[in-house]
Amino acid sequence: DAKVSEKFAKSTKRGPLNYVKSAIGEYLRYRSQRYKITTPNGVIAEKAFIIACGNASQYGNNAYIAPNADMHDGLIDVTVVLPITPFDTAILGLLLFSKHIDQDTNIISFRTPSLTIEREREGIIHLDGEPIMMDDRIDIVCHPLSLNVFSRLRTPDKGNFFTNIESSFWDFINSIRSELNV
């Protein structure tokens, strides 16, 4: 995700098509890394494709990486995407836009007030929409209710095509994937 952002930021062309081209190119070159995630509740050691941390549910553009996130609970929502196949990528894309990514078998999700991520090497991360270089150790802490923001009144979410699809459909997809071992 961070490499795609970096490539897209350096590109002279804009628009969704150029973003998709950047994403496909980076996906084909990217190799998952082994990560160690330490929280107050324990340690997780996994090889991962993406680790996303935040206190809001959206990546942006109606892509929900942490559908149950609450900006007021003082917790960081962590979504770990385990190594995936091209087939998994298509399914995860649908789940990302339907607010059901946390139901996929290739996802580990949890909440914590703080965490440390240790990875094999330093590299680019995606921080609030910007690609930046970080060390092989990243410490993350939530400072609850510390940012004051002015905004319009919130209106009820009426959903969209994807959010109105029944979750049983995703159970069906996951059962097929399990049977096919993908």
Where are these regions (language model features)?
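Long C-terminal subdomains/extensions of small-metabolite kinases
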Residues: D1-V182
